[in-house]
Amino acid sequence: MSSRKVVVSKARVAVLLTAPLWLGACGSTTVVDDYRETPVTNLSHEEAVVVLGRRHGAGQDTEIDFISCVGNELSQGSSALAVIPEKLFVDSMYPYFETSTAPMDVKNLDRLIQNPAIAEKFAEYRLRFFVWIDGSTETVDKKGSMSCAIGPGGGGCFGFASWDDEANYEATIWDFKNLALAGKISTETKGTSYMPAVLIPIPLLARVQSNACKSMADQIHSQIGTPLR
């Protein structure tokens, strides 16, 4: 079962110091695709989730702060999940979840747990779901210019700049209990940030990565379900 939704996030900011009025709005739009392989499962309060980033090499890694953001979002609120921090998990499982050795599909987990030490560690963590996230946030276009100078009477910056950011991420959810693919989620977030400067630069930022994180976490939560207390 698959679904798609669009989330528009817009922040309006009053810009002083003669900045044009149309600079008072910057925002982002998020498109979410959701594919569910299995029905929503309610975890027991003892079961845990680990969120991991795919690491491909220099310049292609999923950002560590994005993985932390998704994990933090999942572990907050009245329906908080038990989330194992990525670094803690990877370090404790060394070297089985490093870049060159991490399992690439759920079938490889079955082979991995044939190792008694790995099986024992998984049981200790009470792992139920692995969430693998692949993707990144990039600046795709820049416009405008800005110059700053310092003189005897003081200094300042003048000009205008804008840039477009795109965040593209895909999450694959593995159900460790059933050794099956639970579902996939993809998010695409786009936004434009502005920086007018009349003496002082005023950044008006579109929270592209932050909005992508929240949308991703919401959809992961909807697939995994609510812990049973």
Residue map of PLM features:
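Bacterial N-terminal signal peptides that target proteins for export
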Residues: 2-15
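Bacterial N-terminal signal peptides
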Residues: 14-24
